[in-house]
Amino acid sequence: MNAGRRQRAIFVEQFYFPEGWGGAELPRDITMYLARQGYDVEVICGADLYAPLEGDPGPDPRAAGVCIRRVPRLLGGDIHSLKLLRQLWFYMGLVPRLLCVRAADVYVAQTNPPLTVPIVAAVARLRRRPFVLIAMDVYPDVIVAHGVLAAESVVNRVLEATFRWAYRSARCVVSLGPVMSGRLVAKGVASDRIREVSNWATGATGVVRGPANRLREEWHLGTDFVLLYSGNLGIGHEFETLLQGFMAARRIAMGILLVIVGKGSRLEETRQRVQQLGLGSAVRFADLVPAERLPESMGVADLAVATLREGFEGLIVPSKVPGYLARGIPVLYVGPRSDIDHLIERYDCGYALRNGDVAGVTAAILDACGDRERLLARGRAGQAGYESELRRELGLARYETVIGEALESLRGKA
């Protein structure tokens, strides 16, 4: 950044510090990094927490110079109840905060909640400033894939036109991988405006294994082989194939456990399915842990799991996978062919199976249990790939480049 006037960046994301959800920790990393690079950074966010944490929430962005403006909380209780009303309230609070503060040199938004995208795009257009979109999801396609909207409905056509305009108006759109980039091009985003920046691991990236890991005792894991699912259990994640494959594997090798650490809209549904399948004694559920205990929660894993529902490929990319790779944990991915397949194939760091392939999932689990040396080698390969191409420092530098490119476009118009 030049030594003249500090460039002003406004970020919009509903969930921000202090927050346990990985999707909110990433913008915290980005905004703190930019503030330390000399940018004048302001974040407009909500007061609700998607995944509240007990204990230390990690570094406070305000200590790095980030200004935080919050839309006050409307409702208490479960964040997943009355979700649309909560989002509407956030939009109503967002608009005056965008219009009444000093104009930014660049506006940046993630895709949460969805209508943030066209709102921030419109304000950036009104202010004649560049707009940078971080596409954690692709809308309204995610809503259609979930079955909430019919593709041919009038509402979806209106939303499609609105989001298509917003995506195309962005000076830069950050994509999480090549499959998502293809979705964005299909939406009309020019390929030369797309920048691929993978998510990175949040929290402490070490692992604590063996008897030193207190969670093995707290969660009653003993010396069993552990599959770990860590993170959000949302609308885009599929669990039936995983649970069926896990159940079949346990019929052959009893010393296997599944640990699910996280929250999300499908958590209760997953709990119920575990009970229906008679897997209650083999599956452990736990809340998200504070950042300082991530080395322990990740350290229980012999094999880490990511899933994706059919139709969600390229619409979302599970951010838990870079977290697994950073810690040297091999990955079992169950879902349609997606950006996760690209990572697993590139680094030879695990298994990629399709939804419905119960036999394949069973075989992968048994293979992982039966050849620990090969499994450890895959974990090391994934970690080496992460350090070489995906680590936090590289991602932050790429985001700074994206912001710089957007600002160059502004200077070009001057």
Where are these regions (language model features)?
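Donor nucleotide-sugar binding/catalytic pocket of nucleotide-sugar-dependent glycosyltransferases
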Residues: C45, E152-P211, L221-G222, V283-A286
